Amino acid sequence: MTSLPHSPAADRNKQPILDALTRILGEEGSALEIASGTGQHAVWFAAAMSRWNWQPTDADARVLPAMASRIAEAALPNLRPPLLLDVMAPRWPSEGFAFAGEEEKKFDAIYCANMLHISPWATCAALMQGAARRLLPGGVLITYGPYFEEEVPAAPSNIGFDEDLRARNAAWGIRRLEDVTAEARKSGLTLRERHAMPANNLLLVFGFQ
């Protein structure tokens, strides 16, 4: 049997993120995950949050078969097969796919981990705009990853990581929290909660103003 792609970082952070999610979210609901990658988070969260229906997605069609295999192997009734979703596309999910015919389906939560710093800045605006369209009233957008903050000394590891990202792609880089929250406000979302996480990461919760 071919081994599935594995992210050590996803294994390290999945439990701290889950602990935060269980404090933030209600007992049941529906969640859309953006940039699911290997699907490790989707499986871990869906297994622990059995009353949440979890929809994983990714913008890279090449990762979907392996993610689908991991999800099928998990055999969780509340975890759906992955879909192709590019936040920059005018429709979520992307052209040619649908949420089982529910093209305008909305969610109680949208979750996006480790995407904003490894994609162009335009994806931040697209994420906020799409979340505003796809969230139910009272719903939340939850993002996770490294951020720079005004008046908060940057961790040396994050400074080095940012330099490495920008050397690899000039459009990448750790984002300033103030810029992200300003972009969210343009779409009617405001920062509700900020949670410090291990390894100098933050988990942010946005909701409607």
Please describe what each predicted stretch is:
Residues 35:
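Conserved S-adenosyl-L-methionine
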Residues 32, 40-92, 97:
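Class I SAM-dependent methyltransferase SAM/SAH-binding core
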Residues 1-27:
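Class I SAM-dependent methyltransferase Rossmann-like catalytic core
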Residues 118-131:
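A short, conserved alpha-helix within the catalytic core of class I
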Residues 138-147:
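Conserved beta-strand signature within the Rossmann-like core of class I S-adenosyl-L-methionine
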Residues 189-209:
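Core SAM-dependent methyltransferase catalytic element
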Residues 154-178:
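Conserved Class I S-adenosyl-L-methionine
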Residues 111:
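A conserved beta-strand element that flanks and buttresses the S-adenosyl-L-methionine
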